[in-house]
Regions:
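Short beta-strand element of Class I
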Residues: 8-10
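Conserved N-terminal Rossmann-fold NAD(P) cofactor-binding segment
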Residues: 12-49
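Glycine-rich beta-alpha junction loops
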Residues: 15, 99-101, 123-128, 149-157, ...
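N-terminal Rossmann-like NAD(P) cofactor-binding module of classical short-chain dehydrogenase/reductase
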Residues: 54
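Conserved NAD(P)H cofactor-binding loop of Rossmann-fold oxidoreductase domains
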Residues: 57-59
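Rossmann-like NAD(P)(H) cofactor-binding subdomain of soluble oxidoreductases
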Residues: 67-132
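Short, surface-exposed amphipathic charged segments that create phosphate/polyanion-binding patches used
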Residues: 131-140, 158-167
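Conserved small/polar residues in nucleotide/adenosyl-binding loops
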Residues: 171-173
Length: 173
């Protein structure tokens, strides 16, 4: 809302009331935002002229269940989402944020038939943001001055290359 990066935001959910409620909540923040964005609950057909579709749907991860255990459940969910989006005439970019994110990004790539540069996964970007925030708290610096990344496959095999972490572009961790 505050970055004014789009003129329309459409929320699609199998639970239509939830999508409507979330769209209403976000819309109520518009009077305080520097944009005239339109926010609404919608249908897959609304994706026809979208530049970006963010997929964050999926089965919940149960206690003791690995991200890879989610694969079969989420494959079914993604099949029911990607096909109607493609059928709408969507010709933009997919951004995948559902676990297991790296594998689900490949699933969207396969199901959509889109070129690889139009199917992107969030990967370890959220983990990197969390790491940078925790480091900024620990070292009492602005998070924007922390340059550290989590790399690898999102999940149990990701890691931090500590020798590459920087604070204020001066201090090597």
């Amino acid at each position: 809302l505050n970055q004014n990066i789009c003129d329309e935001l459409v929320l699609i959910d199998i639970n239509k009331e939830r999508a409507w409620g979330e769209a209403a909540d976000l819309s109520h923040g518009l009077p305080f935002a520097p944009s005239s964005m339109k926010i609404k609950a919608g249908e897959y057909s609304d994706c026809s002229d979208a530049d970006l579709v963010v997929i964050c749907a999926g089965a919940p991860q149960l206690p003791g269940e690995s991200r890879r255990d989610l694969l079969q459940k989420n494959y079914k969910v993604f099949s029911s989402i990607v096909q109607p989006i493609i059928a709408s005439g969507f010709n933009g970019v997919f951004l995948v944020a559902s676990n297991p994110v790296d594998i689900m990004t490949q699933v969207v790539y396969t199901l959509s038939g889109f070129p690889a540069n139009r199917v992107v996964g969030s990967g370890t970007s959220l983990d990197s943001a969390r790491l940078r925030h925790m480091m900024s708290d620990y070292f009492h610096v602005n998070p924007r001055n922390v340059h550290a990344y989590v790399i690898g496959e999102h999940g149990d095999s990701e890691f931090v290359p500590w020798s590459q972490a920087l604070i204020l572009s001066l201090i090597h961790i």
